[in-house]
């Protein structure tokens, strides 16, 4: 998985996120922007997709135009609870909170490529990341590949 501006996760700062937002790229294979109104269901779909493919980042409190809108409905506890309650198995993830000069809170959720796929949502669906979107996997060959990847770990 790539890093934001080539920074290791523990060294990531707000300025690195701001530089990412200034770049010409929109949402990509590794980055998903979500505003504060995003539903828990959509967050879980994105996390499932990232964990089932190559990992990635959700930048929460940032709209599709890469404007910082901030978060009032989401906090670290809600993010953790949503992930713990709605995905099986639990993927490897971490959350960082940043506060802008304008006092807007944003969260960066880092999702690792999973070692024990498939990562299944609480409604029984399995997602994958394709280009800049997350989609349910309906192809039996792709599902078989995920289960095979899991078996390789044991």
Segments and roles (model prediction):
Residues 1-154:
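Conserved N-terminal catalytic/coupling substructures associated with nucleotide/phosphate chemistry
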